Amino acid sequence: MSQSYINVIGAGLAGSEAAYQIAERGIPVKLYEMRGVKSTPQHKTDNFAELVCSNSLRGDALTNAVGLLKEEMRRLGSVILESAEATRVPAGGALAVDRDGFSQMVTEKVANHPLIEVVRDEITELPTDVITVIATGPLTSDALAEKIHALNDGDGFYFYDAAAPIIDVNTIDMSKVYLKSRYDKGEAAYLNAPMTKQEFMDFHEALVNAEEAPLNSFEKEKYFEGCMPIEVMAKRGIKTMLYGPMKPVGLEYPDDYTGPRDGEFKTPYAVVQLRQDNAAGSLYNIVGFQTHLKWGEQKRVFQMIPGLENAEFVRYGVMHRNSYMDSPNLLEQTYRSKKQPNLFFAGQMTGVEGYVESAASGLVAGINAARLFKEESEVIFPETTAIGSLAHYITHADSKHFQPMNVNFGIIKELEGERIRDKKARYEKIAERALADLEEFLTV
């Protein structure tokens, strides 16, 4: 592929990081950003890497998975992290930034780089003859979204309005749940949390009275599109959930079940199912429980489910308008397209969730786009690192049930040997191993 530059489309967190990484490797970049020509409902300025919702890049401690990811990115020369550190504001253990100062600094560092040419224009076609990183965000313009949709054979680039909570399997009380698939079809693939009639009535009462998170103004018209939040379903009638995600039919108690039940009934009054969410089996999601409750309310209400009294939520349910790819089928672990090899994708459209995760994906995509340009082999970061585990998760998850994911210790490769029971000590050990493995990886 003969060319003299690399395209980057989109100057959000992922695109800005990708462009900077490419330019730092001595390769000219054409960075396309449509803001300035065409606005979006969310953005207030034309600056790069504008933080639309929150000014927080979340926890900074290494015992927090996103803190580990940020430390890895610092060591990889992230322009996003450099700008965040320079514009940080007091926020306890979190890294929060002056919103305007942060985006202005990213804009200056990227736009003033001698090898980056900024082009204020909307791209409506996918380049076929130039290495290109596409990082156009969750609200990709309709024209370009249509081209990506076609590239994916009409599949895998679709709106996402809801996600169910995901739980650390080690925090589920296994004495209160049982393994079974409905009607015993196939393998016993679900953990089932049975409820008596009274438990269900109490749960329903708590759910319909729980406080929902407010929607951003630009999301309101999309609220009910393509999904049914569990709390909305519950408000339609006391038995509505019993014909939906809490349907007990075909999920009889096992013979050795000793927990509470209504009389001699062989089938629970209601059942909440949990499905394995990652290949390692360390994460489970609550099936059909997409929600827009406030996070504190999710914890309060969903911990009423038998077996989840002490559950740790690695991701709470969320609802907002988004578009993302079927990355397990469409992307390599390097963020390179399987269908059109000159293309890389980065940011929320790949199925990573969160500011830091978006920037991290742009960092990896930028590094690999530069390596392809130089005819060098692409790199896959170790699965023991946060940045590597995120790339692995979105490209190896079950495609049929794939949903956006933020970084968490549940997706990072387990430590070898006996499990460390103290959570803080375990996370410290995972972080220590991650940074050691990253250093070794960078010296090879």
Curated annotation (Swiss-Prot):
GO biological process per UniProt: tRNA methylation; tRNA wobble uridine modification
Signal peptide: none
Ranges that cross the membrane: none
Cofactors required: FAD
Primary gene name: trmFO
EC number(s) recorded for this UniProt protein: 2.1.1.74
Major location (coarse): cytoplasm
GO cellular component: cytosol
InterPro entries: FAD/NAD-bd_sf (IPR036188), MnmG-rel (IPR002218), MnmG-rel_CS (IPR020595), MnmG_N (IPR040131), TrmFO (IPR004417)
Cysteine disulfide partners in this protein: none
The reaction(s) this protein catalyses: uridine(54) in tRNA + (6R)-5,10-methylene-5,6,7,8-tetrahydrofolate + NADH + H(+) = 5-methyluridine(54) in tRNA + (6S)-5,6,7,8-tetrahydrofolate + NAD(+); uridine(54) in tRNA + (6R)-5,10-methylene-5,6,7,8-tetrahydrofolate + NADPH + H(+) = 5-methyluridine(54) in tRNA + (6S)-5,6,7,8-tetrahydrofolate + NADP(+)
Chain's role: Catalyzes the folate-dependent formation of 5-methyl-uridine at position 54 (M-5-U54) in all tRNAs.
Residues annotated to bind FAD: 10-15
Subcellular location(s) per record: Cytoplasm
The protein, known as: Methylenetetrahydrofolate--tRNA-(uracil-5-)-methyltransferase TrmFO
Keyword tags: Cytoplasm, FAD, Flavoprotein, Methyltransferase, NAD, NADP, Transferase, tRNA processing
Any one GO MF annotation of this record: tRNA (uracil(54)-C5)-methyltransferase activity, 5,10-methylenetetrahydrofolate-dependent
Keyword Kinase: no
Assigned protein family: Belongs to the MnmG family. TrmFO subfamily.
